[in-house]
């Protein structure tokens, strides 16, 4: 499954590719989504900025679109709307991994049951679950940046358990990632402390937007892969 911003990034990148190839004026790019607004779970600030960028690129957004049938080059929604297409890029709904769903780790919804603050399984204290395997059930975004910080945190907890002393940092429920729209980019940031505590929605804002943000992402990507091994 892709990161939640991926459908909007793909739409922007497809639009940019069509523009580069000189066929943008012969093409229509649209986003149909189950949510009423882009990244609705991140609040109106992020959602509004994504809508603004899509609109500037001539990309229409259609919310509340729940597909129920695919036939003859058309997608039909539950409310009767139809989408005709030449190229369809479809994102499946998030679902628990079958291996986990059929294991003793799974809860009633199929996702593992874990302590929301430590990601430790209450039934199997030596087992931790992070990333896409559990985050949808915790109302955390199934995004690489969240899994990255969860991994660092859990590694510290395991080391602490082995050494018998606290040597790690508390989990930092803050995430940011650059959304790449092809010729523009957006850097949102969200704090998920209220989500993990079960007291409310995440607190999100826009840190930066512009072409230079995309250049920053490209530089970081090169650095990441160059230092990965």
Specify the residue positions occupied by each region the protein language model found:
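A short, flexible beta-alpha/helix-coil linker loop
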Residues: 1, 34-38, 134-137
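C-terminal auxiliary extensions adjacent to catalytic cores
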Residues: 188-229
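FAD-site-proximal beta/loop scaffold in flavoenzymes
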Residues: 82-152, 156
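Glycine-rich dinucleotide-binding loop and its adjacent helix/turn
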Residues: 1-23, 117
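A Rossmann-like FAD-binding core segment of flavoenzymes
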Residues: 16-113, 165-166
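FAD-binding beta-loop-beta segment adjacent to the flavin cofactor pocket
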Residues: 110-128, 181-201
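Internal hydrophobic alpha-helix adjacent to the cofactor/substrate pocket in enzyme cavities
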Residues: 16, 147-173
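Short, solvent-exposed loop/turn segments at secondary-structure boundaries
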Residues: 4-7, 41-45, 140-143
